[in-house]
């Protein structure tokens, strides 16, 4: 709500108030683009003042490409397994679907723990899911058995 009020001030008055500095007015009308993956609802007031665009999760091929560029030391086959797992996790009935940042964090954790294959150690696999699952409810939904199934798909 505080962030939304901040955005409304910028979009309505073309200025921003910063307690330490005062009010800063735009010299020209700003162009503001807001992207979303539906992690929060935006008010009608905010939607009226901007172009609102939904950003879909990347397709498997693009996510794999991003993973390989950001973490080039991870084996290609393990990278494929990681991306497949995350893509399959996103279709599960969870509140907070993991984004690219979570995929990268999880891949780094998996690699850092020395896993060469997601099926190497399901206990370690499940313990690292905290990188992907951000709510207690989601952690309850993705049991060790479900994680194991997702790793095999």
Describe each PLM feature range.
Residues 1-153:
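C-terminal regulatory/interaction module of P-loop NTP-utilizing enzymes
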């Amino acid at each position: 709500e505080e962030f939304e009020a901040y955005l409304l001030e910028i979009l309505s008055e073309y200025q921003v108030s910063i307690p330490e500095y005062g009010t800063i007015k735009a010299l020209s009308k700003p162009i503001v683009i807001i992207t979303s993956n539906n992690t929060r609802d935006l008010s009608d007031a905010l939607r009226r003042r901007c172009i609102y665009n939904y950003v879909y999760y990347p397709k498997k091929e693009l996510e794999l490409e991003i993973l390989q560029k950001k973490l080039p030391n991870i084996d290609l086959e393990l990278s494929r397994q990681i991306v497949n797992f995350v893509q399959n996790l996103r279709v599960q009935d969870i509140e907070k679907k993991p984004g690219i940042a979570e995929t990268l964090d999880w891949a780094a954790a998996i690699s850092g723990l020395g896993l060469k294959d997601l099926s190497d150690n399901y206990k370690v696999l499940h313990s690292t899911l905290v990188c992907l699952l951000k709510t207690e409810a989601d952690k309850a939904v993705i049991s060790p058995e479900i994680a194991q199934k997702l790793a095999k798909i």
